[in-house]
């Protein structure tokens, strides 16, 4: 198969004639029951039900197959499973490879619900979790136990945005245990700014809700796996009843068509805002992977092909409750909301003690309020003016 640049892949992948049936876009095929014309057809579908043959709605329709094909071509995987949200993609990927008595290595700066899953669900299953500092590097080898089955990465880290030395971590882990299953929450890079499977990672997970969809109106999760792990991931996720509706799959594929131009704009605008913030007296540190002030910046330059729109910055002081309200409640363009990856700019505030509470296993010397922003497609100078007005409200 001819290898294309990503901008071409975004447009053309997942549009085989079987999926499009003569139209530009893949068909939107909503179905639970799929009809067999004969006993032989039923036997064939049953035999190949895990290989893209129409069998039953839970296995997928042409709409799902088109998105899975697109994702595999984007990320270089052997297969892609679709989930109703990113959290489902994370939890089912882990559950596919662990059992009672096993051990998981988890980034201590991972997405809070991922840590909650380990602390509540895995603990109930008597599966132990050890949290590691994402900047651990080769010392990850010292944490691997005989029963360690999964090493989970996140790049960059949630909120504090550290970039781990992924090649060093992966090499060290595989030196101790070549069969360990390594997976990564790769949402920030949209699965393409960091090519996980090319770095000997087994499974690349995304909350497709973010950049793949790109419009803050669909929830979906994806897990793209290599050949070694695909069959087990697929069958376990199927047995757990994981699936996504055809409309969400269709809308996600449509969103990916513009992913290239969207990521370029997110990068350009976010770096401009980040550089402006780094010059403001109210700001102590900017945690944008593309800036030298971000821990792991050198690994970002080496391993990533670009930046997206999410980053954070620490203020020089811890805001009082009144200052937080004054700062956060009156933005004209920034919206206060969870999630990110859409066309709109978002903002959230965390206090140092809140970060310490959700990161009990790693220590960061945060003293000022931590502001997380996602830079959307508004005029970047107007976004900067909106932030400047916010600083004036806390002066």
Predicted feature descriptions by range:
Residues 1-50:
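N-terminal glycine-rich, Lys/His-bearing helix-loop that initiates the first secondary-structure elements
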Residues 10-19, 80-279, 287:
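Conserved PLP-enzyme active-site core in the AAT-like
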Residues 15-17, 30-36, 188-190, 210, ...:
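Glycine-rich beta-alpha junction loops
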Residues 38-88, 114-120:
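Conserved N-terminal alpha-helix of the aminotransferase class I/II PLP-enzyme fold
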Residues 76, 147, 282-285, 369:
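Glycine-centered tight turns that cap/initiate beta-strands
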Residues 119-120, 128-130, 146-149, 262, ...:
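PLP-dependent enzyme catalytic core of the Aspartate aminotransferase-like
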Residues 252-261, 308-317, 371-376:
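Short, well-ordered beta-strand elements within core beta-sheets of diverse protein domains
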Residues 271-332, 336-341, 355-362:
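Conserved small-domain helix->loop->beta segment predominantly found in fold-type I
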